[in-house]
Amino acid sequence: MNLETPSQENLNFMLTEITTKLKMVNVGVFENLELDSVDYNALIDIYQLIKRKSNFSPREMQLFAEELRRIRK
């Protein structure tokens, strides 16, 4: 899967991976999120950072959640 190419499928995949890895409870916030309503490049950056780490401090989880809120255009 080439995540560099913006698509709805890639968006959904990354959001699922991010919310699973961060063990986010309120994933409903990201349901039905459309590709044109998201800063796709920022999402890729967040996704790549999260995939590299195996553990997250509570503060890191909070910061990632805040960044995910900001990716909406």
Swiss-Prot record:
Q: Name one Pfam family in it.
A: DUF1128
Tell me which HAMAP family the record gives: UPF0435
Species this protein is from: Listeria monocytogenes serotype 4a (strain HCC23)
Q: InterPro entries of this UniProt entry?
A: UPF0435 (IPR009507)
Would you say which domain of life the source belongs to? Bacteria
Q: What is this protein called?
A: UPF0435 protein LMHCC_0855
Question: What family is this?
Answer: Belongs to the UPF0435 family.
